């Protein structure tokens, strides 16, 4: 028999049950139609579940026990930086002076919030080697869009309207070409070298007076540093373009080097990656965008400025791309990031150094049984290409599904696309060597199982709440809304 707690809450609803009690009404009751015209009232009952309080508590507690996150276990999702989120950050975000304010309040009544955002702007700019930031973008892809809009505004002010193309390597994040298209650019894809680095000859052949810029991640999606970055920056700038930094992998280089020093002109951060704010489940995230000095005038309005001892919202920006989000960004997330940066200070460099150390440790321990396509020192993450031995029918997907039986969230699989059977692993700096060893041991045991009992992997997972689903059918026939049977 199906447990009530494996059902939707609508399925355990029983007419007449309720999870609340109200005091006896002490005012005269009136008919709703006497207050609101009938044409504005729905003629349908609200189809809400009728459940008791204990049913509500048990239902959602059971659901929470089925979840997996950084608070419950190791989460090595490559290109996502699933680091632990310190609870001090949460404490600061719910302080009454931050949690109980409203963006419609007069500036003089929210000086603390404006001061925090102004200082965070300066901190993030310093880490990236930029002049100023905007904190408005909601997340990474939104930040990409804003950065590309800044690039477009720059060329427009110069009267260089023929620059309608953005160069993007084939190893780039999938959001890069999507963001470029939404910003109104045509995408020019160039081939990467086998190690994921930019192919200089391909770049040279793509550059022209129609190129607005190049979008690049450094370290690359394969977790390797772009050693030719100075040459790349010079080539793009000599051709009249701008260099855009996708900050997805900033966790590898904080305090070690800065995108601005490499020659990048525009950058976005993923606050929810690098600066330890919660992510997953749809947000909220945060994707601040930074620019070099001559691009500041194009940043979204308003920009927070300090005049004397007062912080103000500056809307007088004739060349601004305009407002790109309601109000001023995801403020609660910004409080968490500000707390994180204050907590670490100069030790942000150690964050990146340990992230790199952890990744290299794992890579070294796993390369005996898993194929390592590029054998060199990595940065914060690395990419494996399936098992070292070609075991008929055992795929990276099978390995990932079997990891679920060992109690782990799998790494990113089949990305980047330039590596066959790719597994992208990013341990982050917050994990101990004991945790890393346990995960390494699980992966190595799975490699042994693949040789001895391959069917165990092909039919995995065996012990999860949901077994292997038909992913093709799920993609083609997506049902995300419950409807009552007629």
Curated annotation (Swiss-Prot):
InterPro entries cross-referenced by the UniProt entry: GcvPB (IPR023012), GDC-P_C (IPR049316), GDC-P_N (IPR049315), GDC_P (IPR020581), PyrdxlP-dep_Trfase (IPR015424), PyrdxlP-dep_Trfase_major (IPR015421), PyrdxlP-dep_Trfase_small (IPR015422)
One of the protein's GO biological processes: glycine decarboxylation via glycine cleavage system
Positions of modified residues (N6-(pyridoxal phosphate)lysine): 273
Keyword Oxidoreductase: yes
CDD domains in the record: GDC-P (cd00613)
Cofactor(s) needed: pyridoxal 5'-phosphate
Reaction(s) this enzyme catalyzes, per UniProt: N(6)-[(R)-lipoyl]-L-lysyl-[glycine-cleavage complex H protein] + glycine + H(+) = N(6)-[(R)-S(8)-aminomethyldihydrolipoyl]-L-lysyl-[glycine-cleavage complex H protein] + CO2
Record GO cellular component, one term: cytosol
A GO molecular-function descriptor: pyridoxal phosphate binding
Domain of life according to the entry: Bacteria
SS bond partners: none
Database matches in HAMAP family: GcvPB (MF_00713)
Stated role: The glycine cleavage system catalyzes the degradation of glycine. The P protein binds the alpha-amino group of glycine through its pyridoxal phosphate cofactor; CO(2) is released and the remaining methylamine moiety is then transferred to the lipoamide cofactor of the H protein.
Family as reported in the entry's similarity comment: Belongs to the GcvP family. C-terminal subunit subfamily.
Subunit structure: The glycine cleavage system is composed of four proteins: P, T, L and H. In this organism, the P 'protein' is a heterodimer of two subunits.
Protein name stated in the entry: Probable glycine dehydrogenase (decarboxylating) subunit 2
Annotated organism of origin: Alkaliphilus oremlandii (strain OhILAs) (Clostridium oremlandii (strain OhILAs))
Gene that encodes it: gcvPB
């Amino acid at each position: 028999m199906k447990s009530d707690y494996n059902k939707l809450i609508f399925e355990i609803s029983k007419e007449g049950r309720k999870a609340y009690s109200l005091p006896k009404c002490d005012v005269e009751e009136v008919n709703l139609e006497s207050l609101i015209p009938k044409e504005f009232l729905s003629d349908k009952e609200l189809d809400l579940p009728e459940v008791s309080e204990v049913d509500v508590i048990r239902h959602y507690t059971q659901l929470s026990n089925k979840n997996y996150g950084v608070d419950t276990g190791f989460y090595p999702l490559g290109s996502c930086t699933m680091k632990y989120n310190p609870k001090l950050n949460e404490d600061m975000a719910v302080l009454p002076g931050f949690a109980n304010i409203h963006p419609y309040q007069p500036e003089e009544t929210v000086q603390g919030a404006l001061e925090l955002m102004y200082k965070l702007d300066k901190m993030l700019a310093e880490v990236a080697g930029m002049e100023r930031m905007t904190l408005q973008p909601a997340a990474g892809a939104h930040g990409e869009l804003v950065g590309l809009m800044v690039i477009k505004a720059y060329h427009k002010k110069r009267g260089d309207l023929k620059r309608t193309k953005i160069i993007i390597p084939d190893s780039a994040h999938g959001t890069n070409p999507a963001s470029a298209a939404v910003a109104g650019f045509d995408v020019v894809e160039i081939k990467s070298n086998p190690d994921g680095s930019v192919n200089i000859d391909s770049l040279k052949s793509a550059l022209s007076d129609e190129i607005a810029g190049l979008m690049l991640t450094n370290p690359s999606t394969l977790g390797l540093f772009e050693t030719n970055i100075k040459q790349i920056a010079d080539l793009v700038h000599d051709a009249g373009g701008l260099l855009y930094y996708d900050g997805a992998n900033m966790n590898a280089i904080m305090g070690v080097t800065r995108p601005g020093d490499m020659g990048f002109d525009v950058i976005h951060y993923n606050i929810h990656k690098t600066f330890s704010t919660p992510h997953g489940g749809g947000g909220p995230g945060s994707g601040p965008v930074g620019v070099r000095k001559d691009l500041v005038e194009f940043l979204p309005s308003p920009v927070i400025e300090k005049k004397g001892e007062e912080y103000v919202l500056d809307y007088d920006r004739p060349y601004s791309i305009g407002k790109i989000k309601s109000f001023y960004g995801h403020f609660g997330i910004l409080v968490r990031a500000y707390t994180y940066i204050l907590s670490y200070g100069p030790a942000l460099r150690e964050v990146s150094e340990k992230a790199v150390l952890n990744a290299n440790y794992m890579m070294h321990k796993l390369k005996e049984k898993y194929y390592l396509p590029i054998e060199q020192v990595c940065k914060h993450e690395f990419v494996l290409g399936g098992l070292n031995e070609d075991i008929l029918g055992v795929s990276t997907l099978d390995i990932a599904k079997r990891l679920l039986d060992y109690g782990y969230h799998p790494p990113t699989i089949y990305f980047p696309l330039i590596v066959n059977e790719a597994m992208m692993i990013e341990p982050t700096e917050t994990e101990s060597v004991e945790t890393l060893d346990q995960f390494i041991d699980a992966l190595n045991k799975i490699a042994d199982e693949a040789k001895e009992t391959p069917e165990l992997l092909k039919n995995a997972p065996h012990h999860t709440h949901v077994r292997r689903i038909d992913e093709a059918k799920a993609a083609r026939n997506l049902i995300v809304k419950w409807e009552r049977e007629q």
